[in-house]
Amino acid sequence: MLTITSFFGFLLAALTITSVLFIGLTKIRLI
């Protein structure tokens, strides 16, 4: 159970970081 929770936590963190980087690159391109 702990492993599954840690896996989802890591997946959520990776998704958040990817979204932030993607939005950042998009804003730089718009500018």
UniProtKB/Swiss-Prot annotation:
Is Electron transport a UniProt keyword of this protein? yes
User: Which topology term describes how it sits in the membrane?
Assistant: Single-pass membrane protein
GO terms for cellular component: chloroplast thylakoid membrane; cytochrome b6f complex
- The residue ranges crossing the membrane are 4-24
Spell out the subcellular localization from the entry: Plastid, Chloroplast thylakoid membrane
Provide any one GO MF term from the record.
electron transporter, transferring electrons within cytochrome b6/f complex of photosystem II activity
Which InterPro entries does this UniProt record tie to the protein?
Cyt_b6/f_cplx_su6
The UniProt entry, under Pfam families, shows: PetL (PF05115)
Q: Name one GO biological process term.
A: photosynthesis
Q: Which domain of life does the UniProt lineage start with?
A: Eukaryota
Q: Which UniProt keywords apply?
A: Chloroplast, Electron transport, Membrane, Photosynthesis, Plastid, Thylakoid, Transmembrane, Transmembrane helix, Transport
Per UniProt, subunit arrangement is:
The 4 large subunits of the cytochrome b6-f complex are cytochrome b6, subunit IV (17 kDa polypeptide, PetD), cytochrome f and the Rieske protein, while the 4 small subunits are PetG, PetL, PetM and PetN. The complex functions as a dimer.
Q: What family does the database annotate?
A: Belongs to the PetL family.
| Protein function | Component of the cytochrome b6-f complex, which mediates electron transfer between photosystem II (PSII) and photosystem I (PSI), cyclic electron flow around PSI, and state transitions. PetL is important for photoautotrophic growth as well as for electron transfer efficiency and stability of the cytochrome b6-f complex.
Stated name of the protein: Cytochrome b6-f complex subunit 6
- According to its UniProt entry, this protein's organism is Oenothera elata subsp. hookeri
Encoding gene per record: petL
